[in-house]
Amino acid sequence: MNTADFDFHLPEELIAQTPLEKRDASKLLIVNRETGEMQDKHFHSIIDMLEPGDALVMNDTRVLPARLYGQKVETGGHVELLLLKNTSGDXWEVLAKPAKRLKVGTRISFGDGRLSAVVTEELTHGGRIVRFEYQGIFLEVLESLGEMPLPPYIHEKLDDRERYQTVYAKESGSAAAPTAGLHFTKELLAEIQAKGVHLVYLTLHVGLGTFRPVSVDNLDEHEMHSEFYQLSEEAAATLRSVKENGGRVIAVGTTSIRTLETIGSKFDGQIQADSGWTNIFIKPGYEWKVVDAFSTNFHLPKSTLVMLVSAFAGRELVLDAYHHAIQEHYRFFSFGDAMFIY
């Protein structure tokens, strides 16, 4: 299969620039992958698609305010850093602008000097390893000085940075939000739990690779980015019990899917507690191990996420659903509407 097989025309005005006032007021396109039937609903209706004894699996990662603006100590020149991942202790892999002037040993100061960094290693493509120096707790300093790294297709300023976090975000470490979870409110989750559905949390820290376009024609040549994931013993035990009792594992978003299917692939279809790095690429032809249904937002043309959804529901049905969503003026991408596929 070729990358072009997953292309579609999206009018630019359908790219959501801001979140809706109410999280669960977004639209929900429900798709039955067996019959091809589609229903236009609102997100709150997801509760009607869940049965007592099912598990709803969510990614509790928290987005870091990972964009930092500073000055070089020696020259006062402006520097922008985007934190990608914590490599060890206070050392981080970052994307730097302008990278060519940031040699090993360059010192950078941020804000009122409460945070500084020194470049310790040069990587390719504008990447650097920097070591941070600060007073107090790093994440608290970052919360006060950093800005949210919104996706490249969002041009509006975000008034409330909590709107780019899920209501259950807990484990700091992502460069982007697991956006399928943005539609849930605490009230809706309480209603779902009261219905007898198990709420299960895992962690996958979303990397910037999630926005990287596929640059090859042949899908077999595409290399996926790696992301850190973790599933606790308690969560794994709940999911095993759900499966044994005939319930469904319903994933919220592609990050939850990739974590569950990584674990299922690693343990021969079994669900075990695990943590590590995954670069799983789920595309048509993939044999599903764990996930029975899922919710997800509408994704970019030719992206690996459209390919993942197509692996579950079939390419033609997914493209039909996307064309339906475009005709019905659904909102696309991170702050957009959602679909539920079962």
UniProtKB/Swiss-Prot annotation:
Enzyme class: transferase
Keyword set, alphabetical order: Cytoplasm, Queuosine biosynthesis, S-adenosyl-L-methionine, Transferase
One GO molecular-function entry: S-adenosylmethionine:tRNA ribosyltransferase-isomerase activity
Pfam families the UniProt entry points to: Queuosine_synth
Catalytic activity reported: 7-aminomethyl-7-carbaguanosine(34) in tRNA + S-adenosyl-L-methionine = epoxyqueuosine(34) in tRNA + adenine + L-methionine + 2 H(+)
Functional pathway: tRNA modification; tRNA-queuosine biosynthesis
A Gene Ontology term for the protein's cellular component: cytoplasm
Keyword Cytoplasm: yes
InterPro entries linked to this entry: QueA, QueA_dom1, QueA_dom2, QueA_sf
Record EC number: 2.4.99.17
Compartment list: Cytoplasm
Record-stated family: Belongs to the QueA family.
Function, as annotated: Transfers and isomerizes the ribose moiety from AdoMet to the 7-aminomethyl group of 7-deazaguanine (preQ1-tRNA) to give epoxyqueuosine (oQ-tRNA).
Subunit structure: Monomer.
UniProt name for this protein: S-adenosylmethionine:tRNA ribosyltransferase-isomerase
Source organism: Streptococcus pneumoniae serotype 19F (strain G54)
Organismal lineage: Bacteria, Bacillati, Bacillota, Bacilli, Lactobacillales
Gene, per the UniProt record: queA
